[in-house]
């Protein structure tokens, strides 16, 4: 007996709420640590941006996931009978639009709390209420997406290649990284303007790059195969979405060897960038300097992400063909 929609989401929402709170609190916790356990008023937009991007990441593949659920019919969707989509609803639930609107809402909430309470109490309440706001928006958007699935078959391919798809995801995660580490521009360990080539600066940047990469790699543990299967059903991608797996030989090597090679390259790269910055007396923002030093890790993350998601896409294609065979 298949569960009805309301029963299924009642069970699923328990996990969703935990995931949203866990991710939101981890990111805000890293921000707070990097800010020296302070919360200046100019960082209200930073915290709100982090939470808004959490929502964006949660809903980016959400319609595709529910397309997979609808097509495979392992949930009873009779609750949606006679429910219609409205044009304004279709517009407001687009990931970019929903993310931008959530940014405005979260910024307004954060500013209000900051005006009423001491800064640390305000941040504490933002950490508690922000993920809850994201969860409530997520629920509303999910309901809209399920209604949209029946009319959402794309007229043309939305993502022509896995490389572009991965690039978009990497850009979003990089923005989250920059927002999270931005308070370090005021840290004694990273105030290196005019003193780029120091042992302290190089080691601090090396550790920071390693921590950021480790967090990003941790979130790659979540599989994309059902999202890709849903996008195949929606015809947003085709079977030529990814034809080959780049650097498969490299990623077949043991993890410790890959990380050791990356460590050597990263040390050499940070040293080279520091030498150049000292010679030309650069005056650039800390975020830009970090991003420049992070390039080897960013390249590794991009190709590893593509490697994993290519395998997920191959599994999605196999499931897609099996489903077509069973429904002949």
UniProtKB/Swiss-Prot annotation:
It comes from the Bacteria. Its main location: membrane. The gene is ycdU. This is Uncharacterized protein YcdU. Keywords: Cell membrane, Membrane, Transmembrane, Transmembrane helix. It comes from Escherichia coli (strain K12). The chain crosses the membrane at residues 17-37, 44-64, 96-116, 118-138, 165-185, 202-222, 260-280, 284-304. The keyword Nuclease does not apply. One of its GO terms (cellular component) is plasma membrane. It is a multi-pass membrane protein. It is found in: Cell membrane.
